[in-house]
């Protein structure tokens, strides 16, 4: 029987780890292990992001004693866990407008401050109860129209079917990350040891917790 993962009510430092420590050895995992062990005076919370649980075997590293909290989330299992009935829905107009504003800001090359202000608004609304919910992304008319517009304006090579499913696969996990950000225990510092989805999770935490 495997040992239960440690859980805590709070920690000093949260490390956001994507496809690395403690399930993968070498490289980034080695220095993560070294960092944690170098600071025994700090309590660490580890958030591991992986593809699917079946892609990982046992831990390759024993968790140091100062890891007081460990949680793991699998990005592509959200497709299997999402049991939403497809149904016609217009979509939330405020949520659609926020996404369009953020996309337009990136296209215009707005200043970092302007784009981050819009990202802050989007991040807040992706949390449970916000106006940007997974159901609308998957099934709403507004989301469909946005994908169609982007494809017409910017995609000349891949088929629309490829574009549509790639968009779903890439973006659907963001709502899982919103739930992770909402539920993470209080910490004093967050460090993203990986970019990609872990970096996005770090951005969500920065913009939803301050």
What does each of the following model-derived ranges do?
Residues 2-4, 203-208:
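Short amphipathic alpha-helices and their capping/turn segments at secondary-structure boundaries
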Residues 8, 45-177:
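A conserved catalytic-core segment of Leloir-type glycosyltransferases
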Residues 9-13:
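Extreme N-terminal starter segment of soluble prokaryotic enzymes
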Residues 19-30:
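A short, glycine/small-residue-rich beta-strand->loop->alpha-helix junction that serves as a flexible
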Residues 28-39:
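Short amphipathic alpha-helix
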Residues 32, 197-201:
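Short, well-ordered alpha-helical microsegments
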Residues 39-45:
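A generic structural motif
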Residues 182-197, 208:
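Short N-terminal targeting/anchoring amphipathic segment
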């Amino acid at each position: 029987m495997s040992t239960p993962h440690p859980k805590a009510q709070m920690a000093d430092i949260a490390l956001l780890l994507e496809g690395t420590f403690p399930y993968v050895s070498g490289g980034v995992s080695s220095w993560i292990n070294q960092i944690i062990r170098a600071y025994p005076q700090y309590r660490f919370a580890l958030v591991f992001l992986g593809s699917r649980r079946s892609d990982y075997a046992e831990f390759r590293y024993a968790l140091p004693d100062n890891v007081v909290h460990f949680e793991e989330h699998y990005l592509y299992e959200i497709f299997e866990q999402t049991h939403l009935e497809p149904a016609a829905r217009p979509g939330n107009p405020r949520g659609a407008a926020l996404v369009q504003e953020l996309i337009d800001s990136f296209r215009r090359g707005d200043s970092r401050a302007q784009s981050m202000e819009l990202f802050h608004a989007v991040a807040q609304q992706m949390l449970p109860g916000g106006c940007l919910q997974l159901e609308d992304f998957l099934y709403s008319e507004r989301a469909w129209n946005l994908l169609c517009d982007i494809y017409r304006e910017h995609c000349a090579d891949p088929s629309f079917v490829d574009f549509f499913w790639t968009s779903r696969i890439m973006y659907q996990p963001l709502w899982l990350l919103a739930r992770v950000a909402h539920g993470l225990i209080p910490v004093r510092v967050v460090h993203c040891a990986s970019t990609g989805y872990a970096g996005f999770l770090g951005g969500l935490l920065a913009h939803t917790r301050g």
